[in-house]
Amino acid sequence: FRERQIPLMIGGATTSRVHTAVKIAPHYDGPVVYVPDASRSVSVASSLLSDESAKKFIQDLRDDYVRIREQHANKKAAPTISLEAARKNREMIDWASYVPEKPKFIGRRVFKNFALSDIAKYIDWTPFFQTWDLAGKFPAILDDEVVGVEARKVFADAQALLDKLIKGQWLQADAVVAFYPANTVGDDIVLYSDETREHPLFVWHNLRQQSERPVVDGVRRPNRCLADYVAPKDSGVADYLGCFAVTTGHGVEKKVAEFQAKHDDYSAIMLKALADRLAEAFAELMHHRVRTDLWGYASDEILTNDQMINEEYRGIRPAPGYPACPAHEVKEDLLRVIGSEDIGMTLTESMAMNPASSVSGFYLAHPDARYFNVGKLSDDQVEDL
């Protein structure tokens, strides 16, 4: 590696090949490889280590990144507007006619040793196949002419291992959910310790879209910010915000080590993939309980699992690091406020959650709340933070 330098492999939910080629590769002399999922990391490492194929692999990679950068440079970006103009074009909500539902409790509640069999019912299987580089939507992928045979094989293997981990209780599923009084001041959401709304727990600084929005049917689309969906403090409306953290990661590393000791890398990767799917399913299950019971703002909701996967419910659960809330740093305040240490969840120096198979975020209940991509910011918003 002295000649090749240490390779850098990039992956994760918020990364992409374009981001790797444009933002990372030009600033590192060694090989930089975008790895879309964990199952491909072994083959990528093998290619980088191989005396026969490494040189061509690295050169092909660099040529590909040059092409991607050229395509990116030739794309016409939407012009940005000033922060003042973006705020004037915020999502307009009639707060005078909105009465927020009050959660059944204020503060936090911990859920330990949740039944894995119940969580498994909420699994979205489509991303599971992406882990194995199999493109297609479940269940149609099982009959796909190109990848159907392989998809059926890994799905059968997944079902068998899932059955074993549920019966053997290999993993532990824990969650913490919290509700707090909340109101907005500008683009910031302020969480309070109690109904007096005098003692802030923390201020969640949010970002607003600044790209010039298109005009549809004579109406310009709004420049959205998550703060638009929580009542402003000066409205006099007593609003609320939910916070959560779930994990199905306890027990994963121990079992993975057992598989690796037997040189069974396939089962080790399969278990990690299932643990990740269970974590996302656990987040879906708890959000369902929040909507229908713990907060109860959609107590009459009756949706199938497919409808929940398609997000046909009221409200959203934005997570730090994703397009509507790209800043990972908010995880520090989020996990502190909900006391994530009670479920064994911590943050690494790079703001990743530990255990890895974990999900955290917020609950916004307003009927108009939706996901969006913050996108490119202008200097005035960066300076305003």
Feature roles, as predicted:
Residues 1-7, 25-36, 45, 114, ...:
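Short beta-alpha connecting loops at secondary-structure transitions
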Residues 10-15, 36-39:
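Short, ordered loop/turn segments at secondary-structure junctions
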Residues 15-29:
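Glycine-rich, charge-decorated loop segments at or immediately adjacent to ligand/cofactor-binding or catalytic sites
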Residues 37-42, 277, 281:
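Short alpha-helices
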Residues 39-269, 273, 294:
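Active-site loops and adjacent core secondary-structure elements that bind or stabilize anionic groups
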Residues 221-384:
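C-terminal accessory domains/tails appended to large, multi-domain proteins
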